């Protein structure tokens, strides 16, 4: 499809320059975009969590879940989507390949709390939420979060009781290196905390999947040299990663370098909704450059990732017998219409969100269409950097929540770029003619299970079928004013149908090896604060962070034992 759309195909076996040159003749679409004479339309900024899909799912008997007998204790799924699994599919753990990993996920700033305890230094999220509470929906912060720093044993017990295989969590960089650098000193209390967590997991039969960086840059590095806007951070991240591999790698066999670099670069530097809260002044930030900084930050993120992978492969992989990858997020995009322009726009949107990171990892350079449209604002890799980045993963983590429609936006060659988000010339929307692409869950997730399967198949076709873990997938309830929202049928439905799509993708040859539900517990949801709840486990923030299983946990536990 990519060649028909006038976009370059990615090769897993050729160098970046060769792939780019061989595909240049395939870009009539890019040329047409560059020469279009219409004025550029105003494009919609991303929705608040920026994952925005189209399928009505029809439960077989009006409910999705478990009945009484052992043969019925599996999830029956019927789908009205043309590419979904066959009309009735019975699902349980045994439906998936042997060794498939089921897990749940979290992130340090979202759950740990203890922001100024145990020797931890501040991160940019501490500064952002303290200095700009108006940027958070309920003016809250992660100072206490879910108190997992002190209640980690309770969380491990919940994982075990559910029957999950793995726990994906992140390490707080500033809890290990309070000043962000090796020279600033290693915090042994932080080392001990993560050792205790890892050991508790293993004692209970739960394997850790550890993310090194989930957006919480040490504030000291932001103050010293502007954080990920500077290439200086690459060596400091490499030192931090080296410490983690050395201290924890004898027990951690699954490493993720970065979580959702797109979210940091776009939400943190194009719109200022996330830390460090930078964007151009006309988007409401005191300082920033929405047209350039996201590209600079992404460039340094990719170099930091590649250098950390090299350290692991050179010094640890052979003896520790682990694997290392990166987690990328993406929506799936359906063309707004059947027109060639909208079909091409859907692929272009994928290039600007997913390909922005995946193309360098596979091919050593950014997508050709980005080079054509962004031009000199898109940084270049040296030959050595390109070779370092290319192939720097054992697996790819994919975070999927929802999908959007993609509509071609008319382009002018002489426009003045003001935001990287609009450089794709794609209007994105969760609705078409006032009709949502799928039922709305929470405030921003349109229920579209088919999008997950289509994204997985796209990655298989375009990027040489890498090993994949679904590292985040889940839905939310908006916080209720009264009562305890333990009744969460939408989560049960969401997970049922998305797992069915994962299974179908596996049957079609995609190398998916695991699925991690977001999230184990309710938590601090970034700019949403505590107004939305993604957890399998309810957190009572008013009563000592009491943990209570929601209704979906009963279903999920049975699913995992079937």
From Swiss-Prot:
Catalyzed reactions per annotation: protodioscin + H2O = 26-deglucoprotodioscin + D-glucose
Pfam families per the UniProt record, alphabetical: Glyco_hydro_1
pH dependence (record): Optimum pH is 5.0-5.5.
Notes on activation and inhibition: Partially inhibited by glucono-1,5-lactone, conduritol beta-epoxide and diosgenin, but not by beta-sitosterol or cholesterol.
GO terms of molecular function: beta-glucosidase activity
Name of the top EC class for this enzyme: hydrolase
Keywords recorded for this protein, A-Z: Chloroplast, Disulfide bond, Glycosidase, Hydrolase, Plastid, Transit peptide
Covalent S-S links between cysteines: 279-285
Binding-site residues, a beta-D-glucoside: 110, 214, 259-260, 401, 472, 518, 525-526, 534
GO biological process: carbohydrate metabolic process
Annotated Gene Ontology cellular component terms: chloroplast
Family named by the database record: Belongs to the glycosyl hydrolase 1 family.
Assembly with partners or alone: Heterodimer. The N-terminus of the larger subunit is blocked and the smaller subunit might be derived from the larger one.
Name of the protein: Furostanol glycoside 26-O-beta-glucosidase
Organism lineage: Eukaryota, Viridiplantae, Streptophyta, Embryophyta, Tracheophyta
Gene that this sequence comes from: F26G
């Amino acid at each position: 499809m990519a060649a028909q759309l006038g976009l370059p195909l990615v090769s897993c076996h050729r160098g970046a320059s060769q792939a780019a040159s061989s595909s240049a003749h395939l870009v009539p679409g890019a040329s047409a975009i560059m020469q279009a004479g219409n004025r550029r339309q105003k494009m919609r900024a991303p929705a608040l969590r920026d994952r925005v899909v189209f399928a009505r799912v029809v439960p077989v008997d009006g409910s999705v879940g478990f009945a009484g007998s052992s043969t019925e204790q599996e999830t029956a799924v019927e789908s009205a989507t043309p590419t979904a699994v066959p009309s009735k599919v019975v699902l349980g753990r045994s439906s998936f390949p042997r060794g498939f990993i089921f897990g749940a996920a979290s992130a340090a700033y979202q759950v740990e709390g203890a922001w100024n305890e145990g020797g931890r230094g501040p991160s940019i999220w501490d500064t952002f939420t303290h200095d700009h509470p108006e940027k958070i929906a309920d003016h809250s912060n992660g100072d206490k979060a879910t108190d997992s720093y002190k209640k980690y044993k309770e969380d491990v017990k919940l994982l075990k009781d559910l029957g999950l295989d793995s726990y994906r969590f992140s390490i707080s960089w500033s809890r290990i290196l309070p000043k962000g650098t090796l020279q600033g000193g290693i915090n042994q209390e932080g080392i001990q905390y993560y050792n205790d967590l890892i050991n508790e997991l293993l004692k209970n039969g739960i394997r850790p999947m550890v993310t090194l960086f989930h957006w919480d840059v040490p504030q000291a590095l932001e103050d010293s040299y502007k954080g990920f806007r500077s290439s200086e951070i690459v060596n400091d991240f490499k030192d931090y990663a080296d410490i983690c591999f050395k201290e924890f790698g004898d027990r951690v066999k699954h490493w993720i370098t970065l979580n959702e670099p797109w979210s940091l670069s776009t939400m943190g530097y194009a719109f200022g909704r996330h830390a460090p809260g930078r964007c151009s002044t006309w988007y409401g930030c005191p300082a920033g450059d929405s047209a350039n900084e996201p590209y600079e930050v992404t460039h340094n993120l990719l170099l930091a990732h590649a250098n950390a992978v090299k350290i692991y492969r050179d010094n640890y992989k052979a003896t520790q017998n682990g694997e290392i990858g990166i987690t990328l997020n993406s929506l799936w995009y359906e063309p707004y219409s059947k027109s060639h322009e909208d079909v091409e726009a859907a692929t272009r949107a994928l290039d600007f969100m997913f390909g922005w990171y995946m193309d360098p990892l596979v091919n050593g350079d950014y997508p050709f269409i980005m080079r054509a449209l962004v031009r000199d604002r898109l940084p270049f890799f040296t030959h050595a950097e390109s070779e370092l980045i290319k192939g720097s993963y054992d697996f790819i983590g994919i975070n999927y929540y929802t999908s959007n429609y993609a509509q071609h936006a008319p382009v002018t060659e002489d426009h003045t770029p003001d935001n990287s988000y609009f450089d794709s010339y794609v209007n994105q929307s969760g609705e078409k003619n006032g009709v949502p692409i799928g039922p709305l869950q929470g405030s921003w997730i349109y229920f579209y299970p088919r999008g997950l399967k289509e994204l997985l198949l796209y990655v298989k076709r375009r990027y040489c079928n890498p090993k994949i873990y679904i590292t985040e997938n889940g839905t939310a309830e908006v916080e209720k004013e009264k009562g305890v929202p333990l009744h969460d049928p939408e989560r049960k439905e969401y997970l049922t149908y998305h797992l069915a799509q994962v299974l179908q993708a596996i049957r079609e040859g995609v190398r998916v090896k695991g699925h991690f539900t977001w999230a184990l517990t309710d938590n601090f949801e970034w700019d949403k604060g505590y107004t939305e709840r993604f957890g399998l486990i309810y957190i009572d923030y008013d009563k000592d962070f009491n943990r209570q299983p929601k209704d979906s946990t009963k279903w999920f536990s049975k699913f995992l034992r079937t």
